[in-house]
């Protein structure tokens, strides 16, 4: 486990799936900053966990990367590959599936919006994506027939349907029970290894970050700044109860407590 104080962005010459330089975000008439001077580079195929106290700007940062909201200052780049510009897919804590569509048709809609016009091809691809998340037999199931974990699997398949370079995940497993969350951790890591996507995963769960991330980035309380980062060399697959994961969890928790105390939260 390598610990570094993350104060600057990586050189612009380094390969990047996401590059943020001096990013600041303010809301309201008084312009109080939520994020301040964020410098962060996510390498192609890297799994980065963003961690911090509630209200530190983690979700706001994801929205900026996704293009849902503009930064007040600084630059956000998704270089992409070759001549194709990069783009990101965003997965929320709630599945946000359309309840009047089946699991498969929810994915088909994403494929249609991507530009896949042929219905047969869309159905075939939707079936393939459901297979990736172990829901091969759930194409025709309605949303109300799916458990919370199954809904999040469908939401993940829908995100994958966008063929994005970067997968942004905003506390996607926070509402699930511990056993389901544990299973989905395993499945997410397998998918990440298979697809080689870049992943930016927001969580307030320190153990979750220690289990999943190749790198864990800690944001300070408002205004959110990068306070610390950990480069994690614990091999995957990891378990929550692994000694190395427990040690890392303790180290991150201690720093998180310092940040919370420092800012009076």
Predicted segments — roles?
Residues 112, 119-138, 190:
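Conserved ABC ATPase "signature" region
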Residues 66:
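Helix-to-loop junction immediately C-terminal to a conserved catalytic motif
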Residues 142-146, 150:
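Conserved ABC ATPase signature
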Residues 51-53:
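The feature captures the beta-strand-to-loop junction immediately N-terminal to the Walker
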Residues 101-109:
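Short coil-to-helix segment of the ABC ATPase nucleotide-binding domain corresponding to the Q-loop/switch region
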Residues 73-86:
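Conserved ABC transporter NBD signature motif
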Residues 161-165:
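A short, proline-enriched helix->beta-strand linker immediately N-terminal to the Walker B motif
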């Amino acid at each position: 486990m390598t610990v570094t104080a993350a104060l600057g962005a990586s050189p612009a010459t380094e390969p990047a799936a996401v590059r943020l330089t001096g990013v600041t975000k303010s809301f309201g008439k008084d312009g109080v900053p939520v994020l301040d001077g964020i410098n962060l580079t996510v390498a192609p195929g890297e799994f980065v966990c963003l961690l911090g106290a509630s209200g530190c700007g983690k979700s706001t940062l994801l929205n900026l990367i996704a293009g849902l909201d503009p930064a007040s200052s600084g630059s956000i780049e998704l270089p992409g590959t070759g001549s194709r510009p990069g783009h990101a897919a965003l997965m929320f804590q709630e599945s946000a599936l359309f309840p009047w569509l089946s699991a498969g048709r929810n994915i088909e809609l994403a494929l249609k919006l991507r530009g896949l016009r042929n219905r047969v091809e869309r159905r075939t691809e939707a079936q393939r994506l459901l297979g990736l998340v172990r829901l091969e037999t759930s194409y025709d199931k309605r949303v109300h027939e799916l458990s919370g974990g199954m809904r999040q699997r469908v939401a993940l398949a829908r995100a994958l349907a966008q063929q994005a370079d970067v997968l942004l995940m905003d506390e996607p497993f926070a509402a699930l029970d511990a056993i389901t969350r544990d299973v989905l951790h395993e499945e997410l890591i397998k998918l990440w290894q298979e697809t080689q996507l870049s992943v930016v995963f927001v969580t307030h769960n320190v153990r979750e970050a220690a289990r999943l991330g190749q790198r864990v980035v800690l944001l300070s309380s408002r205004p959110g700044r990068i306070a610390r980062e950990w480069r994690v060399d614990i091999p995957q697959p990891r378990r929550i109860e692994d000694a190395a994961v427990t040690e890392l969890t303790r180290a991150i928790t201690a720093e998180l407590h310092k940040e919370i105390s420092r800012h009076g939260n």
